[in-house]
Amino acid sequence: NTGNFMYSTLNLPLIAHQAVEEHVPFYTLLDHYCNIVYDTLKFRRSEVEKVLYEYHMSDFLLQKDKDTGKPLYDLDRCTYTIGFCGLNEALIVLEDADDDYDGESIVKRLNMNKEMFNRRDGLRWSVIASPAESTAHRFALINRKKYPNSPVQGTKKNCYLTNSSHIPVSNPSTIV
């Protein structure tokens, strides 16, 4: 198979802040942002299709396997991925929400969106806990700019979100 095409990472604490601030259920916003990821990755795919099939800028990707005759690179065999970062900090923010949330149900909700996308277009959608330290730092800066008391890890100068789905042992929140 071809592998992962692209992924977009959701800033879970920022979504949580928005939910608390606007008194909107967190899952309503999470679903909304998952749909934005869907639309974004579908748009990116359409642009790559143009590069491959209309502009022929990467013809080497269209070479055929000598045994099967199928293209070595096939956009239909790629995985399209919803990434997430800051589950720990999102749970801290959501302690002030009107509803109760836990980490497991948030990840299950992301998975539910993924399954819906799989059925919608037949492509291979997945969910990953984004492993990008630079994203964890950038998201923390964004969150602190908009919400000065937003929970982060590290120091004021070198802040970051807890990577992916990790929750520190010292956190009183529970993943389940």
Predicted region positions:
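Conserved phosphate/anionic-ligand binding catalytic regions in large, soluble enzymes, centered on
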Residues: 5, 74-91
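Conserved catalytic cores of very large enzyme subunits
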Residues: 1-76, 97-100, 104-176
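Short, hydrophobic beta-strand segments
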Residues: 12, 89-94
